[in-house]
């Protein structure tokens, strides 16, 4: 991906006593400093900071800020950009007005009074003139690039799927993070999987950064354009969902249930299709009702069922993607162990490359990777390992290609399930070890009676406060920690005994346990886990999450450490506020 500014400019957080907002028409989250860095450069901000202490009337500064404000409001509003592209006369008048303001600043210069100060003003004016000229030239550049893109890409998809309009660009400037950097040049919404490779190749020839996008539910900013010369390829029209099929996978001697999906299929639809056939789709992230299959693969998504069947990687039989070279790549798992991939001594994959038409085979490769490579000892999923032993597509967040479809292995859910909700009111340090105790007990129970822990989720007190959690215990007040888990098996008595023992473990750690048997009651227990959007409301609607993996034995230490950081930062903020009074 391209970056919006030089790294040095981003890291050089020069002393900025306040997020100054002197630039007019700036209704974005960017401060004056950030706008000046983008339009004029770091040197201009240094000059402005120095001249700010030497203002007399401030008129020249106001006129300069008006110039920057006019440029900025157009740059951040695709509708204004389209209007100015369609009206050359209006655009010419705007540019003339910008030059007029700069000329008025020029007239107010007094080199005879303070030559050093005047030299800085001259340097600032030169940077502003360059910015206005670049602003003027940008319209011709954008118009030409749009013409080339429309001509090139319309050979491979319907012209209505090539979107330059303001609504499409605004809709694709951010994802669930609400972080906005640049508006994409174009949004592509292909009708079929077959169109993908040619579109990718066309974008590469045009010099565009390609950003795959599905449901836009990510909290890591993976679908956010960082450069204006970018094309967002939206896969939401790729919604073909096959029937559940029992097929013999390569290297296996029996048929297994699978389902084929295109990248734009919403995760919950796949889960519903599997459930209708009496089976389970193991990939169930919190965003299942909005996220798409392509993103699940790109992020190697998990969910509560990952305890039992692993993440997306563990459950993929095969997948299809477009490489950055515009070629088709089909990846097929060989000798699938139908369980967690790290339990297999060797995980083998066949990679078949085809040209953009998908008809001519180019080459075939084979990857044989030790299963243990895919997990980190003591942690499980290693979120820092984007290379993942060279396996394409999975956990790459769209950086090595665009996933278009996949075939998944489905599983049989045991007949009886109970959901337990455990509320802990003691100190977090005392409550957290119960997670390890429950896990160890359930893993031993699985070997002894076949009863399985099909999911286990941890909710801390800050999350509970954000989602408005309703305490089930009669104690009142919010718990310090909540655990929600599914216990499942074919023997109803064994499941009931296991659930009771889990509740007993919670009782020994200042906790209380509640068990749900009916499907509706179980769904209510899990409802609070899906209220992730409430966190965004609780944090001023801006949320970037990078996944972290915590070793369970050190969970208590982690919880206390995070709480300490929160308290220290809160106190520091209060002290600074008090000092300003």
What are these regions (language model features)?
Residues 324-354, 542, 550-581:
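Internal, charge-rich low-complexity segments
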Residues 241-251, 257-437:
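FAD-binding subdomain of flavoenzyme oxidoreductases
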Residues 2-201, 218-258, 286, 409-410, ...:
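N-terminal flexible segment immediately upstream of the FAD-binding catalytic core
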Residues 318, 418-439, 443, 447, ...:
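Glycine-rich, acidic/polar active-site loops that bind/position phosphate-bearing ligands
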Residues 158-166, 281-286, 364-369, 373-381, ...:
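Flexible, glycine/charged-enriched surface loops at secondary-structure junctions
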Residues 162-166, 188-190, 210-214, 221, ...:
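General beta-strand structural signal in soluble alpha/beta enzymes
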Residues 204-209, 238-244, 251-252, 276-281, ...:
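Secondary-structure transition/capping motifs at alpha-helix termini
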């Amino acid at each position: 991906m391209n970056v919006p500014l030089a790294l040095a400019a981003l890291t050089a957080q020069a002393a900025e006593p306040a997020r100054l907002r002197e630039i007019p028409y700036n209704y974005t989250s960017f401060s004056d400093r950030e706008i000046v860095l983008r339009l004029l450069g770091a040197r201009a901000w240094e000059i402005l900071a120095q001249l700010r202490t030497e203002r007399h009337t401030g008129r020249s500064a106001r006129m300069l800020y008006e110039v920057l404000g006019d440029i900025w409001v157009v740059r951040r509003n695709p509708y204004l950009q389209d209007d100015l592209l369609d009206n050359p006369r209006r655009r010419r008048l705007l540019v003339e007005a910008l030059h007029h303001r700069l000329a008025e600043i020029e007239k107010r210069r007094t080199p005879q009074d303070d030559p050093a100060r005047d030299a800085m003003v001259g340097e600032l004016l030169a940077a502003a003139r360059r910015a206005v000229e670049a602003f003027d030239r940008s319209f011709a550049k954008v118009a030409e690039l749009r013409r080339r893109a429309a001509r090139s890409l319309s050979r491979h998809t319907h012209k209505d799927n090539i979107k330059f309009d303001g609504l499409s660009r605004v809709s694709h400037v951010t994802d669930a993070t609400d972080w906005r950097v640049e508006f994409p040049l174009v949004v592509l919404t292909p009708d079929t999987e077959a169109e993908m490779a040619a579109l990718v190749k066309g974008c590469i020839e045009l010099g565009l950064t390609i950003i795959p996008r599905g449901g836009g539910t990510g909290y890591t900013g993976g679908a956010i354009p960082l450069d204006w010369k970018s094309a967002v390829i939206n896969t939401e029209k790729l919604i073909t969902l096959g029937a559940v099929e029992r097929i013999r996978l390569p290297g296996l001697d029996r048929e297994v249930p699978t389902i084929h999906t295109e990248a734009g299929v919403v995760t919950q639809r796949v889960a519903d299709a599997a459930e209708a056939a009496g089976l389970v789709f193991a990939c169930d992230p919190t965003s299942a009702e909005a996220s798409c299959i392509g993103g699940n693969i790109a992020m190697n998504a998990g969910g509560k069922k990952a305890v039992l069947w692993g993440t997306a990687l563990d459950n993929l039989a095969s997948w299809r993607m477009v490489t950055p070279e515009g070629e088709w790549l089909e990846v097929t798992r060989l000798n699938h162990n139908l369980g967690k991939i790290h339990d297999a001594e060797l995980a083998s994959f066949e990679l078949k490359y085809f040209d953009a038409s998908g008809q001519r085979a180019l080459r075939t490769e084979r990857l044989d990777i030790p299963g243990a490579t895919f997990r980190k000892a003591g942690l499980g999923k290693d979120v820092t390992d984007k290379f993942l032993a060279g396996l394409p597509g999975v956990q790459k967040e769209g950086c090595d290609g665009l996933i278009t479809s996949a075939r998944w292995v489905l599983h049989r859910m045991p007949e009886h399930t109970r959901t337990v909700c455990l509320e802990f009111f003691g100190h977090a340090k005392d409550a957290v070890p119960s997670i390890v105790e429950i896990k160890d007990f359930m893993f031993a129970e699985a070997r002894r009676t076949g009863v399985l822990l099909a999911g286990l989720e941890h909710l801390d007190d800050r999350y509970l406060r954000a989602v408005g959690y309703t305490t089930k215990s009669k104690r009142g007040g919010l718990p310090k920690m909540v655990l929600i888990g599914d216990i499942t098996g074919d023997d109803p008595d064994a499941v009931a005994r296991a659930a009771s023992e889990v509740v007993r473990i919670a009782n020994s750690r200042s906790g209380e346990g509640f068990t749900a048997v009916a499907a509706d009651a179980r769904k209510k227990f899990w409802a609070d886990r899906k209220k992730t959007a409430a966190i965004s409301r609780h944090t001023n609607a801006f949320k970037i999450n990078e996944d972290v993996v915590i070793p369970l034995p050190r969970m208590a230490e982690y919880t206390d450490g995070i709480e300490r950081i929160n308290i220290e930062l809160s106190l520091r903020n209060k002290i600074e506020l008090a000092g300003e009074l």
